[in-house]
Amino acid sequence: METLLPDIRYALRMLRKSRGLTIVALLTLALGIGANTAIFSVVNAVLLRPLPYSDSERLVFLSESSQQIPDMSISMANFDDWRSTNTVFEGMAAYRTQNVVLTGTGEPERLRERQMTASFFPTLGVRPILGRVIAQEEDKVGAERVVLLGDGFWTRRFGRDPNVLGRKLILDGEAYTVIGVLPNQEMHGLWRRTDVFTSLWRQEDQMGGAARRGEHPGMYAMARLKSGISIEKARAEMKRIAGGLAQKYPDTNRGTSAETIPLLQAYVEDVRPPLLFLLVAVGLVLLIACGNIANLLLARGTQRYRELAVRRALGAGNWRLIRQSLTESLVLSLLGSALGLLLAGWLTKGFASLYYASVPRLDETSMDRTVLLFTLGLSILTGLFFGILPALQATRADVHQALQEGGRTGAVGASGRLRNILITAEVALSLVLLAGAGLMSKSLYLLLRADGGFNPAHVLTASFSLPDAAY
């Protein structure tokens, strides 16, 4: 530790002395580490960060499955049996999403509606910031129509007016009474984009035959595990219950089972492979950058061969030379990481401002503590990775040869071989990336050129939201 500060000062002097090399290395590191940090911030927000609900690891997603359809919506009658016979969940709720049209006040507006059972918010552990949630007596056919507002819709349509409770909203031609407003921070993740929340069973009188066993009206379920119950045990029990229903109702349930997976996994499983692929791709780019920087440092080490030999002659041991060289590499890497953080911060803000329905939680991307720790660890590993070969090269300085031959000849052979190996590795990694990019480009080209069976020229599409009661 006594020599750490002198080593850092010496490293900074050497970096100033080789300004061209330093600038190239810093820019290379900034791009490599910045890209890795930016992509990891997305991976962290989408895949790693827990859902913003109490004990979210106990929340699971439930669906039905068959040999033909591995993940399908749930029959309402089956859901009733699941909820009444299971022993592994302390709460279970069903829900579905659709679009409704708001009329009656101001301009008509198409809204995203979540229809759910009364157990939905208690199961999640979410409480409204105004009013209350749907009561059990309101969660049945013939009950009064009530609605909760999402924070975004409340802000956009009512200017966060606290007197919104009790107002009437006309949704698809039916009057609903506003009973509550949900907090924005609790709705991040799964249902942040939902505008209004209504009773699912209240809609049963509008579903007709869709409410019968064997019908699947786009409804799914989620549940909260009891304390101490593993997801494996819950999965086994749900399959047992589904098997019993298949025997009891063979006409509608034969060949169907139940699927139980963590709620977060269900939400992000479609985007996990492409995000991890992107993380691997930018990791390969950083490896190539490390190879480039290692080559630069090896070339500079050849020029410093006589200096290193003299230091050995004055008593510097191998470990001392390695430590000095690694310190210089780590200082360079940390400086490059600082620049990379600036780039990553700019990219992260761009990601957070985007909204893609196919990438959930993308707007939650941020430079939090996990991302900063990742960047710090990555910068240290990067510095060690591209600095180890130049550090080992420093121990090869031969005192007698350097003094007799003027300094550089003895280092050329070993250094040249190492640099050739690095160049070969860089080319190999570059070919892997180019091949992957080429395959993806070809797939996109074929997809765009695929024959849809009709001529799409001058053809437009339109969608209409029709009320369930009338259609």
PLM-predicted stretches and their roles:
Residues 37, 41, 45, 151-152, ...:
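Transmembrane alpha-helix boundary and packing residues in multipass membrane permease domains
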Residues 51-99, 216-222, 447, 451-471:
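Membrane-proximal extracellular/periplasmic loop immediately following the first transmembrane helix
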Residues 267-285, 370-374:
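N-terminal membrane-entry
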Residues 32, 280-290, 381-385, 431, ...:
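Hydrophobic transmembrane alpha-helices
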Residues 40, 331-352, 434-437:
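Hydrophobic alpha-helical transmembrane segments that constitute the membrane-spanning cores
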Residues 99, 112-136, 145-276, 349, ...:
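Mid-to-C-terminal secondary-structure elements
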Residues 1-22, 263-268, 296-323, 327, ...:
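Alpha-helical transmembrane segments of integral membrane proteins
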